[in-house]
């Protein structure tokens, strides 16, 4: 399946501007163009856009994303290095998830305190009426 940038944008949820930026940064390897020099997104290009979205959402720095792309361009002999980059990122994600879990619990406790206080205030106002 081959898609235009507009179709790729609709497929991935990325803006055409973001897709063009990714291409300028060299993050979409082997991107084809048609006879009019329009970008053509095949399944591999769409896969890269989806992966880049995932990596961005999970906080991988652009430099590390570029590293994965460059390693991929070098061929299968770099698969161990790509695994190492992704495992490092995954470990960072686990650390951040633990931090978020702790923060979430703290906020839940604070909300419970505020909601209890709010009920006490309502009860006090009702008693004064």
Briefly describe each language-model feature range.
Residues 10-13, 37:
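Conserved beta-strand-loop-alpha-helix junction that forms the acyl-donor binding cleft
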Residues 4-5, 10, 29-32, 43-129:
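Arg/Lys-rich, alpha-helical DNA-contact motif
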Residues 36-42:
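Minor-groove-contacting beta-hairpin "wing" of winged helix-turn-helix DNA-binding domains
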Residues 8, 15-18:
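Short glycine/proline-centered loop/turn elements that form peptide/ligand docking sites
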Residues 1, 15, 58:
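Flexible coil/turn residues that form the inter-helical turn or adjacent wing/linker of helix-turn-helix
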Residues 19-35:
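Major-groove DNA-recognition helix of helix-turn-helix-type DNA-binding domains
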């Amino acid at each position: 399946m081959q898609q235009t940038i507009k179709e790729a944008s609709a497929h991935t949820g990325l803006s055409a501007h973001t897709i063009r930026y990714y291409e300028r940064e060299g993050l979409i390897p082997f991107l084809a163009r048609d006879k009019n020099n329009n970008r053509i997104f095949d399944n591999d290009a769409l896969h890269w856009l989806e992966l880049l979205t995932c990596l961005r959402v999970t906080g991988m720095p652009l430099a590390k994303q570029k590293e994965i792309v460059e390693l991929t361009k070098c061929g299968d002999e770099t698969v161990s290095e790509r695994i190492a980059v992704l495992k490092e990122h995954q470990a960072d994600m686990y650390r951040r998830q633990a931090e978020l879990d702790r923060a979430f619990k703290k906020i839940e406790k604070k909300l419970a305190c505020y909601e209890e206080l709010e009920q006490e205030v309502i009860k006090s106002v009702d008693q004064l009426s």
